[in-house]
């Protein structure tokens, strides 16, 4: 699948057909460009970059600016991949309005394909 960027509809079709796809994490241009030449369909720029790239002991200190700074080069390095940008702790829990502001910033400033947040059923009202 290298060379053809997947879409949400492609993933929906995969699900309907019971097909699997690969999802990896990358934090910079070099990592992303290597993945771009593979058959991996999705790259996550996760808040785990706090521990892997910034030396933090947890993800809690990762800021929205940190995420944007790392998502941007991944998008540039992997133009053929579906890029997911993680929303860091504290950027969406306060209110649905805060979540929309944060998600909008990530999407507009990085051109990633979607954002991800954590929280399960508790976050359902925010996602709606």
Question: Whereabouts are the PLM-identified features?
Answer:
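Alpha/beta enzyme core
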Residues: 2-128
